């Protein structure tokens, strides 16, 4: 094995024109707001990549240097740097960031950054909030990323300790330009890789002693129940655990299939593949390879150990020989049999033979890059190991408690990870262990999972603990199935966002303050987040109110008009409100003019291939555009020629509304040559004036009323992928008009209050309409009831 394949991509050497250097210091001007500072007593500096940083080759920014003798002054449009040329100290190195209050925009060396935080290594045993590590964004406008103690990357693909006791850190002084800050972080530390398409479907996972027969029966039950999954996770009992002879210790680590449970592993995995599943196996590699393992003889021989000695092969990711043996003799043979990727469940600390080197980082780095060896897109599944871990997706967040407190923390935890570039967390949806049974909690957690980077249902080894939908009450079962289907419908949208995350440096999930950093309200809703370009999400993390049968979520609605994804209800933005929903829905809002491509699903379909049938949601607004991007979903390299794009546009003016699907461009071989389109127009309640394909009237178009979003459905079948579709509505097409009184009636009908109060409230609303709010506030109503009435009557549309 050539270990050079483990060298990080990028050019770690900066441009000479960007450097200001002295006998013991070096300052590198990467951008006008991103500066590298180094100090070393021995006068040596680091030009190799590190565990965190892989590229310093930035265009030289504009800057000015003023040499004041004993003090050095550097100026850019964003920063003033004042440095005394000595060992870094609070009095000797000061940076002022442009904009804002001067007292809040000054940093002295050693100041603890007051940033917006980032993420954490794990949520293991979390029951609510946990501390988070630093991020790169701050309301003060600056933050610091310390790279002094990471390892350097050698040209041979191995890590190496750095020389001397040197200071090496990066100052981010972007003010509130959070998106620009993040994009330059990716430029410095490596881009987020493109994920395989199958990762965006639902994952099934359970810590349970499955047998091959039981797992197959489970998959067939999912098919019967129309609950789609695309990834089958098999936890640790796939290998020998309880049958390990005591002389070898525990069975926590293992690489030998338990043939009692899985008598024919290749056949089992082939069966799963034929049913549309990719397979990942759980491994805890800390105990190395012991003599009872099937692979032990060949592993021992390759490591220079006599197999007859039964001497264990110790786990050591600092040994190049072990790394080669570990992959070629343990993992590659099992991948040949059908394993698609590995769940690296490392829980054994941060110590290796090399001081300061974290074994988790080594596992993530080497496993991810090795996973390309079969010519497929790289993937691993493991915990976060510090800044730069975004290069090794997907993240496994660990074993959370099954409580409402855990659920409440998870939306914030997920969105906030973008502040350190970590965009692909996978949580134990529904919680892992302890806690309590609460069907409503499970429903809300699954809803969150569907609108999360990954949706992986999971639970611990407990006969009462499982996330199969049919184990819950009928209402929650229905909710779970509906949302599992929705996740698979969302794959075309999610996969396009996957490309955007990798190429544009824009994570799928982003905190609300990214786009409105000067709005105080955006910092007050930590559980709200953008979900790609078209949507924002405000998950419900509280129980239903017994009076209304609804639960609320505090929500900041950004500027503009927004529409409810599920029911088409319109909201005027620029304000903070409580949004109330029953158990069947959650607050997901779509910005005006949005176009959202979905997979059109009827019945059971767990395929994540580029679909032949597409469903497109089109929302009111003057204009909108969405480019659907598709490739084969698993090609190892992200090349332009792999992709096909389908551009969709919508315009609305005094002449009417026009929606166009342009002919597919690019590598059309990876998509069906003919497609059927279900186009749903929110709030338009007339048939189109005209439907054309390549300029010719399409007489076979079908039309239907869309009751869910109060609109019109246009159906076209077997349209060539290289054809243009155009749907035109007349300027006077009927538009849905909301009936406030009817909406209030529906709420009151279900409310658990006196009939007299129902009658009184309804009378006030009928008489005063949206002007009824002050009267309702004075009526001493249940807070939940008043909240939902306020939502309906103050939406502004």
Predicted regions and their residues:
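Generic start-of-chain signal for non-secretory N-termini
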Residues: 1-22
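Catalytic-domain carbohydrate-binding cleft regions of carbohydrate-active enzymes
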Residues: 2-4, 11, 81, 93-585, ...
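A low-complexity, Ser/Thr/Gly/Pro-enriched, surface-exposed linker/loop concept
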Residues: 5-6, 30-69
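Short, well-ordered beta-strand segments enriched in hydrophobic/aromatic residues
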Residues: 27, 35-37, 74-81, 536-539, ...
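Surface-exposed beta-strand/loop patches in extracellular or lumenal glycoproteins
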Residues: 36-42, 545-558, 667-687
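Solvent-exposed beta-strand/loop surfaces of large extracellular or lumenal domains
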Residues: 48-62, 305, 563-583, 690-714
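A surface-exposed beta-strand-loop module
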Residues: 71-73, 79-80, 702-724
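Accessory, solvent-exposed terminal regions and/or long lumenal/extracellular loops of proteins
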Residues: 593-696, 719-721, 728-797
């Amino acid at each position: 094995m050539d270990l050079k394949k483990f060298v990080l991509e990028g050019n770690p050497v900066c441009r000479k024109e960007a450097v200001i250097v002295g006998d013991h210091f070096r300052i590198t001007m990467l951008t006008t707001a991103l500066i590298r500072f180094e100090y070393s007593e021995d006068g040596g500096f680091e030009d190799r990549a590190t565990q965190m940083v892989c590229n310093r080759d930035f265009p030289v920014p504009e800057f000015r240097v003023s040499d004041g003798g004993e003090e050095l002054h550097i100026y850019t449009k964003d920063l003033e740097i004042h440095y005394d040329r000595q060992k870094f100290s609070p009095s000797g190195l000061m940076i002022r960031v442009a904009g804002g209050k001067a007292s809040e925009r000054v940093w002295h060396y050693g100041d603890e950054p007051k940033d917006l935080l980032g993420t954490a290594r794990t949520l293991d045993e979390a029951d609510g909030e946990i501390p988070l590590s630093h991020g790169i964004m701050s309301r003060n406008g600056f933050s610091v990323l310390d790279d002094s103690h990471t390892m350097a990357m050698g040209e041979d693909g191995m890590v190496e300790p750095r020389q001397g006791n040197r200071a090496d850190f990066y100052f981010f002084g972007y003010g509130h330009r959070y998106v620009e800050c993040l994009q330059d972080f990716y430029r410095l530390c490596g881009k987020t890789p493109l994920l395989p398409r199958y990762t965006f479907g639902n994952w099934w996972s359970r810590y349970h002693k499955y047998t091959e027969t039981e797992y197959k029966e489970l998959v067939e039950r999912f098919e019967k129940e129309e609950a789609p999954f695309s990834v089958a996770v098999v936890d640790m009992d796939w290998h020998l655990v309880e049958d390990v002879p005591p002389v070898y210790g525990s069975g926590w680590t293992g690489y030998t299939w338990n043939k009692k449970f899985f008598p024919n592993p290749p056949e089992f995995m082939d069966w799963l593949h034929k049913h549309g599943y990719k397979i990942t196996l759980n491994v805890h590699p800390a105990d190395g390879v012991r003599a009872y393992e099937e692979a032990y003889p060949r592993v021992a021989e390759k490591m220079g150990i006599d197999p007859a000695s039964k001497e264990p092969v110790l786990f050591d990711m600092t040994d190049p020989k072990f790394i080669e043996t570990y992959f070629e003799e343990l993992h590659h043979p099992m991948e040949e049999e059908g394993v698609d990727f590995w769940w690296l469940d490392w829980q054994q600390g941060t110590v290796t033979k090399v001081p300061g080197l974290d074994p988790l980082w080594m596992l993530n780095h080497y496993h991810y890059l090795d996973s390309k060896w079969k010519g497929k897109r790289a993937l691993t599944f493991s915990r976060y190991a510090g800044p730069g871990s975004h290069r090794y997706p997907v993240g496994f967040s660990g074993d959370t408690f099954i409580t409402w407190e855990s659920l409440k923390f998870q939306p914030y935890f997920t969105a906030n990870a973008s502040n350190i570039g970590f965009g692909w967390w996978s949580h134990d949806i529904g919680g892992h262990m302890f806690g309590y049974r609460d069907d409503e909690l499970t429903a809300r957690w699954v809803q969150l999972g569907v609108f999360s980077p990954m949706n992986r249902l999971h639970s611990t080894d407990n006969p009462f603990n499982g996330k199969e939908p049919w184990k819950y009450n009928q209402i929650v079962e229905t909710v779970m199935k509906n949302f599992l289907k929705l996740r698979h419908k969302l794959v075309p949208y999610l996969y396009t966002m996957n490309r955007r995350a990798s190429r544009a440096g824009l994570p799928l999930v982003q905190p609300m303050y990214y786009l409105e950093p000067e709005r105080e309200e955006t910092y007050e809703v930590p559980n709200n987040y953008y979900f790609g370009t078209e949507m924002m999400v405000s998950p419900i993390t509280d129980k239903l109110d017994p009076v209304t049968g609804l639960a609320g979520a505090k929500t900041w609605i950004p500027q503009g008009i927004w529409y409810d994804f599920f029911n088409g209800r319109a909201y005027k933005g620029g304000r903070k409100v409580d949004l109330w929903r029953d158990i069947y829905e959650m607050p997901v809002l779509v910005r005006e003019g949005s176009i959202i491509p979905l997979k059109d699903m009827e019945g059971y379909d767990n395929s994540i291939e580029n679909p032949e049938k597409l469903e497109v949601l089109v929302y009111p607004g003057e204009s909108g555009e969405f480019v659907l991007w598709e490739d084969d979903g698993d090609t190892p390299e992200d090349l332009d020629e792999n992709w096909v794009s389908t551009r969709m546009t919508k315009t609305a003016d005094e002449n009417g509304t026009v929606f166009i699907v342009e002919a597919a461009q690019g590598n059309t071989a990876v998509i069906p040559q003919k497609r059927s389109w279900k186009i749903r127009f929110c709030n338009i309640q007339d048939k189109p004036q005209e439907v054309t394909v390549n300029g010719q009237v399409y007489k076979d178009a079908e039309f239907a009323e869309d009751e869910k979003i109060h609109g019109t459905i246009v159906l076209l079948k077997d349209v060539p992928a290289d054809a243009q579709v155009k749907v035109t509505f007349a300027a006077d097409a009927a538009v849905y008009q909301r009936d406030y009184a009817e909406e209030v009636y529906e709420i009151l009908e279900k409310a658990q209050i006196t009939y007299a109060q129902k009658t009184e409230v309804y009378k006030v609303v009928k008489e005063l309409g949206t002007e009824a709010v002050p009267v309702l506030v004075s009526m001493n109503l249940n807070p939940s009831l008043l909240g939902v009435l306020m939502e309906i009557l103050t939406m502004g549309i």
